[in-house]
């Protein structure tokens, strides 16, 4: 079951301060942020069946609880960003640790080899 925090996409960029993948308490940072910033936490639960797809805004606080089953939990993730997206110059923590290996050393532009253009809107 996927968990989304309702309205959290409006809270702005909030990079995780600690461990991003498989932390001991996956809601710790959410609870700390909400308390510090007087935000209400309202969780919406979304059951994504095998073969199903879920989409969400990149700022949305999301996650899932522990997998207590004997089965592995598998997922494929695709991050879709606008064609003019750039690496954030001040985002050094959280997921930046994961994605910094895709950054060009001489630019904040996304590298086409890792972030290919999927569609173009011809207005």
Regions found by a protein language model. Give the residues of each.
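Non-heme Fe(II)/2-oxoglutarate
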Residues: 17, 53-55, 59-123
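Double-stranded beta-helix
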Residues: 1-61
């Amino acid at each position: 079951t996927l968990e989304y925090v309702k309205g959290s996409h409006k809270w702005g960029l909030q990079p995780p301060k600690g461990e991003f993948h498989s932390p001991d308490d996956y809601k710790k940072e959410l609870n700390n942020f909400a308390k510090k910033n007087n935000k209400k936490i309202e969780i919406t639960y979304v059951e994504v069946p095998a073969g199903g797809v879920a989409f969400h805004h990149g700022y949305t606080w999301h996650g899932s609880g522990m997998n207590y089953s004997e089965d592995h939990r598998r997922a494929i993730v695709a991050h879709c960003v606008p064609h003019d997206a750039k690496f954030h110059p001040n985002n050094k923590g959280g997921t930046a640790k994961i994605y910094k290996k895709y950054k060009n050393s001489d630019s904040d532009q996304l590298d086409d080899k890792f972030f290919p253009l999927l569609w173009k809107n011809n207005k």
